[in-house]
Amino acid sequence: MPIKTFRPYTPSRRTITVADFSEITTKTPEKRLVKGLRKTGGRNNTGMIMVRHIGGGHKRAYRQIDFKREKYGVPAKVATIEYDPNRNARICLLHYADGDKRYIIHPVGLKIGDEVMSGPNAEIKVGNCLPLKNIPEGTFIHALELKVGKGAQLVRSAGSQAQLMAKENDYAHVKMPSGEIRLVPIACCASIGQVGNVEHNNIVIGNAGRKRHRGVKPTVRGSAMNAVDHPMGGGRGHSKGGNIPRSPWNQPSRGLKTRPKKSWDWMIVSDRRKNKAGK
């Protein structure tokens, strides 16, 4: 995916980069697979802010993605490659031989007209979905399940890929994009290949307007707030407050360990932090 740059006729245009949507084949999504999406503004059902810095943004329609890939043994052809405003990866529309249509995440190398299939007897090629026990060790995968039949939960963002390292009894060792090696039930399914739109992490937003268009609001420093709004707020001028940096909820924001000491995740073989064992 090429990235477009612009002549610096304004200060922000100097740094802005935009994705080249040359791989997109249609602008109109499949109507049957689209539903409305209500904005929350980061609030829960009682109106309290659960996630800060969310609000506004362009209206979106939600594309229903098939993360379960449960149509075993039914071949499908790639009909379109489309833009999805709800994720940073592209999606592609599959036309199944029985007439069904479904969206999946678009992996690198999958083209219009290619045939894909899911199931234990599927071929090891890009876009196919198989249980981990049927995938050779060393294969790069994406759209990985954590629980059998629940649907893909891991490795779904643009450019990401995991690697199947080993198989042992009822579990497979999978190396995640973060470097963490964890156990996954060997009956869980995963898709072959790397998620597309690999150059997404090189895109520079460049100005505030693009950020607001995406529904992201500004992040205000705590020291710039009033004392009633933040533990580090208040004072005259640029006041340091004489205390350690704290979060808006008065927790020390640097170095405080929040994970319970008795917690143990035995499914983490090697932690992403300096390759520690899971604790």
UniProtKB/Swiss-Prot annotation:
Outline the segment boundaries, as ranges, of region: Disordered: 224-279
Q: Which SMART domains match?
A: Ribosomal_L2, Ribosomal_L2_C
Q: Which InterPro entries match?
A: NA-bd_OB-fold, Rib_uL2_dom2, Ribosomal_uL2, Ribosomal_uL2_bac/org-type, Ribosomal_uL2_C, Ribosomal_uL2_CS, Ribosomal_uL2_dom3, Ribosomal_uL2_RNA-bd_dom
Q: Please give an example of a GO cellular component term from this record.
A: large ribosomal subunit
For this UniProt entry, the molecular function terms from Gene Ontology, in alphabetical order, are: rRNA binding; structural constituent of ribosome; transferase activity
Q: Which UniProt keywords apply?
A: Ribonucleoprotein, Ribosomal protein, RNA-binding, rRNA-binding
Q: Name one GO biological process term.
A: cytoplasmic translation
PROSITE patterns attached to this UniProt entry: RIBOSOMAL_L2 (PS00467)
| Function in brief | One of the primary rRNA binding proteins. Required for association of the 30S and 50S subunits to form the 70S ribosome, for tRNA binding and peptide bond formation. It has been suggested to have peptidyltransferase activity; this is somewhat controversial. Makes several contacts with the 16S rRNA in the 70S ribosome.
Q: What is this protein called?
A: Large ribosomal subunit protein uL2
Organism this protein belongs to: Elusimicrobium minutum (strain Pei191)
* Gene coding for it: rplB
